[in-house]
Amino acid sequence: MESNNYINFFFKKKKYTKSVADVRNIYCSPRKLRLVADIIRNKKVEYSLFILKNIKNKGGGIIYKILLSVISNWKNYENNINNYNIYIEKVLINQGYQLKKIRPGPQGRGNKVRKRYSNLKIIINSKFNNYYGT
C-alpha cells in the first residue's frame, strides 16, 4: 500500500503556471523591438494582443505572432483554458548577430552597413507578480 503512494508521488502531473517562447535571429533591430516591448511589459495578455494588433510598427507584428505562440504553449500544459488571468511576466530582447556589408561612399570610400538581428524571449504567467523593469 505504501509503495503505491510512493509511486504516485513521483508521477504526479505538475501544474505549470509559466510558459516560455525563445526566438533567435529575428530580422529586426533590437531597438525597434524594445519600443514595442516596453508598451506590453507587465500587462494582461488580452490587452497586449489588442495593442499589438493595432500598432503600426515592424516589431508589433513580430511580437504579436510570438505572443500567440506562447499562449498556445501555455494551453498545451494547462487544462483550464482562461486567457483572462494570464500576464506577461518578462520580455527580454537582446542583440543577435550583425550582417556587415560595405557600401560605396563618396570619393571612393566605403561605408559600413550593419544589418542587426535580435533575440526575443517572452515569459507569461498565470499569477501576477510586480516585476518592474526587466
Curated annotation (Swiss-Prot):
The molecular function GO annotations come to:
rRNA binding; structural constituent of ribosome
A Gene Ontology cellular-component term:
cytosolic large ribosomal subunit
Subunit structure, per the record? Part of the 50S ribosomal subunit.
Name the Gene3D superfamilies for this protein: Ribosomal protein L22/L17
Which sequence ranges form a coiled-coil region, renumbered to this chain?
none
Q: Tell me the protein family, please.
A: Belongs to the universal ribosomal protein uL22 family.
What species was this sequence derived from? Karelsulcia muelleri (strain GWSS) (Sulcia muelleri)
Kindly give the Pfam families that the UniProt entry links to this protein.
Ribosomal_L22
**What protein name does the entry list?**
Large ribosomal subunit protein uL22
Q: Name one GO biological process term.
A: translation
Domain of life where this protein originates: Bacteria
User: Keyword annotations for this protein?
Assistant: Ribonucleoprotein, Ribosomal protein, RNA-binding, rRNA-binding
Q: Quote the SUPFAM superfamilies the UniProt record gives.
A: Ribosomal protein L22
Q: What does this protein do?
A: This protein binds specifically to 23S rRNA; its binding is stimulated by other ribosomal proteins, e.g. L4, L17, and L20. It is important during the early stages of 50S assembly. It makes multiple contacts with different domains of the 23S rRNA in the assembled 50S subunit and ribosome.
Q: Tell me the InterPro entries matching this sequence.
A: Ribosomal_uL22, Ribosomal_uL22_bac/chlpt-type, Ribosomal_uL22_bac/org-type, Ribosomal_uL22_sf
